[in-house]
Amino acid sequence: ERYGVDPAKMYADSGKVHDHARSLFVVARKMFEKDGYHITVVILLRDGKPIDFRELRPGEHGHKFLMMRRLAQQAQKIGADAAVLLSETWSAPANPAKPYMRAVDSPDRIELLTATAVSKDGDPLHLSAKILRDGKNVRLADTIEHVGGAHFTFAPLYEVWEKPIPKDWDQLPKGTDGVGEE
């Protein structure tokens, strides 16, 4: 086995979505450290068991929204009640002078390997490890775990699950134009 991983042991015995995310992230780290990259994959779960696994390959940024809409339709069709998304991503601090600048375009961006688990019931879990590149050498920093947060990518899933808008979404700063300010 290329990665030293037993596929039968990739998922958590507990069947809990957060435990699945942690277990899958350990595997993703091994794959990344072996290959120097990780493809974007999503696993849909029902009652703690994986029922759908797919690679997502957006051609451009706008395709991500369409892919998540299709994923939500599939989740609804097969009765998925949770999802784990594993991917590489860019992150950057907000720039008040350029509020619409994407992280990939920021000079202050960092690259991360991430896993985000969401479910019909319960809070999301986000795992991340900073990608450290030195020429051809690549390694990952320690894993950081965060429960909660505003993971807008999953809005289409929340919609089909009829999940209330998370409170974390209301706590975000409002736009610089005053819209939404009281």
Label the predicted regions.
Residues E1-Y3, Q74-E182:
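Low-complexity intrinsically disordered segments
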